Structures are given as structure tokens and as C-alpha cells.
Amino acid sequence: MVDWPDPGTPVRLTVKTWAGLAEHTGLALPPAGPKLVTLKLVNGYNISFPHSYVEDVEELDEAPMVEEEPEPEVEQDESLPLVHLIHTGGTIASKVDYRTGAVSARFTPNELLDSVPELRGIARIRAVNLGSMWSDDIRPRHWNRMLQATSEAFSEGAVGVVITHGTDTLHISAAAMSYGWAGRGGRPPGRIVVTGSQRSPDRGSSDAAENLIAAVHWAAHGPEPTGYRDSSVVVLHAGSSDGSCAVLPGCATRKYHSSRRDAFKSINQEPIAHVGLGPDGPSIEMGEPSAYDARTEAIAPMMFEESTKIAQFVADAHLQPDMVQAAIDANYDAMLFHGTGLGHLPIADPQEDSPENTRLRIMLADHCAAGGVVVVVTQTIHGPIHMDVYDKGRDSRWCSLTRAEEGGHSEP
């Protein structure tokens, strides 16, 4: 049994390896698992060893405890544009508490400017902390809070806002911001950027700082939004290496990869722009210009109805009529089907051996005839919906199913 010191204690750990004894110096953390010791190394990475590998644990001299004093308000360049940073969660604006190993929000202007000093020359920062949520726990009520925070930012003189967000559902919230501000044909008063990081700030490979710099630069100095692809944008790494961040349309972006730094790509279209991050500071390289004139500026965003219930189904061999009937019986406001190929559902029985297909067809037709809302998109990442290529598509029209005809792929 290893006598492991309290979290936050400076230690020198000696462990047995195949090459002999090795020493590691850092801060003790809570064990990452049973019968493990875990250390925060000086390079920011965590390392764990089984108890059986531990040869010696030496506690180093404690650093003198200094009583923290309130920090004075950081001075910012008043000539720079004002940008509000709205924190909802995620690791991009977080710090590690080395006493506990926990991650907490780092979200005062002082903390942000100290950790990412490049922001000082880009914009004046005003921080707003909406919470620290796992992105998969976000609901429509949280989209409304984000929309309200963006509206307040613009009314207080901000030229842009940056929403920091966990990456797993970042693209969905970005789409919500886009539809909230532009869903009625308008455009937001300023730039709305949603960003996050795939790697936490305590890791040497973290993308947090570059993503935040690029996002703030776009929010402060990007072009005025037109209300089309750019009502909100996603700004994250363009590739696995540093040096460039992509500016992606908030209503047409998807997370492609669970862990890569360039996990997000735009769907059926090119990025709006790229933000280069070179030694001379950030710079914007625009893509193809918009073919549309800017919409009228919206006075306020459209809020989402928080009680709306939408049932989602995947069209495959296991889609059963009773699953759909349960949603109908529960009075869901709408049903969304992720169809196959060009947007098809299992509603035909050519071999007369799958009566559930016929039941599903009749059930959906009756539901639509009674005023129910049924929308079909395609599971494929790219490509449109097209209902006139196969009989299945024309049969769906007969059922009165609604197709997302233009770019109806399974993005937000």
C-alpha cells in the first residue's frame, strides 16, 4: 500500500520501469483509479502508475502559503472594441485546481488576460458566466439564456460575443443561436462566435488558447453579419496543427471526430473564412463572398419554446411502428426521422413479408392527415434530399411527410 500524500503536495516519485528507476516531479493528485498514484507533471500532463511500480515517494518542501488579496481591476485599452465572453462550460476557459485535480471556470477578465495575454491587443473583454455545464446536458432553456446574454451584450455596446462551450454539442447550440437571431429573416446586431477546445488547458497539446484568440479576433474585427451563413459562426482549429482556425457557418457545421483538434467541418459548403495565427498576430482570410445582400438587423432574438417535445428516429431495420406510436400517444409536437439515402423510410413491403412497414406507412399518413408534424432528413453527412428519384420518395409524398429539401442532412 502506497502512502500517497494529500492532493496538491509537491512530490518526487521514483518508479520502476523496464529501463530501471525513473524519477518524476510534480503535484500529487487524487488517484485516477484503484491502486494507482497520479501526478501532475510540470509540463501539464497527468501520469499514473500502479502501486507495485512505486519505489519511493518523497514529499518536497511546501511552497510558502500567500494569502490571496483581491486583484485590482485589470486595465484594458479603451480604444479597442468591446467583446463579451459568455461562458457556458467546457474546458476552453477553465483552470486546474492542483489541490484536487478538478477543473473550474477561469473567467474573470484578469484570469483570462493573464492566461491568454494575446487578447489584450485584440479587444476589451467583459466576462459573463452563465454556468459550467457538460454540453450534452444543455436544453432549449439554456439556448434562451445564451440568446438573452447575446442580446444584453449588444445593448451594452459590444460589437461581438464569444460563447465558450463544451464541444460535444457545440454545433447544435451554434445552430440555435443562428436560428434564434435570423430565423425570422433578420440578422444579429453584431458577430456571434461559438468556440471550445478539444484538449484541456493543462495539456501541452491544448487548442484552447488559439481557438480563443481566433474567436475573439473574429468577434472584434470580423465583417458585419449578413444574416445568412454568418448569423453565428463556429471558430475552431482548421487542422490538427496550430496556426489556423476555421470560421464555419453556425447553422451548417457538424462534429466529425471525437478527439481531433480539427473535429468540426462545414456541411455542403466551404468555410466562411480562416483566422491565421502567426507571429505578427491574428489575421482574417475571407472565403467566397456572400451572393446575398445583408438582411435587416433584428431588434431581439426569437426565443425557443422550452416545452416543445420532438421525437427523433433513425430509419433502419429496427424501426418499429410501436416506437412511433408511443411518440404519437405521448403528444409529441413533432417527429424527426433520419432517413436513409435521399431521405427514405421503411414504408414498403414488396415481398409481402414485412407487415410492419405497411403499418408504419399508414400510421404516418394518418398522423399527418390529423395535423401531426413529421419531418425527414437524410442520415448521410453530405448531399440533399430528393423525393423524385425513387418510388419510395414519391410514396413518402403520398404520406404527406415533410422533407428538408434544401440540404436536409442530419446536422442541427
Put a short name on every predicted segment:
Residues 1-76:
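Conserved RNA-binding domains used in RNP assembly and mRNA/RNA metabolism
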Residues 47-49, 196-279:
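Internal gly/pro-rich beta-alpha loop/helix module
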Residues 86-87, 97, 108-109, 114-120, ...:
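Accessory alpha-helical/coil subdomains and C-terminal extensions
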Residues 99-106, 175-193, 208-214, 218, ...:
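A glycine- and small-aliphatic-rich helix-loop capping segment at beta-alpha/alpha-beta transitions
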Residues 124-153, 314-328:
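Glycine-rich oxoanion-binding loops at beta->alpha junctions
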Residues 163-190, 347-363:
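Short Gly/Thr/Asp-enriched flexible loops that form oxyanion-binding sites at enzyme active sites
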Residues 320-381:
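Internal helical hairpin/lid segments
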Residues 373, 382-412:
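Interaction/scaffold regions that mediate signaling and macromolecular assembly across diverse proteins
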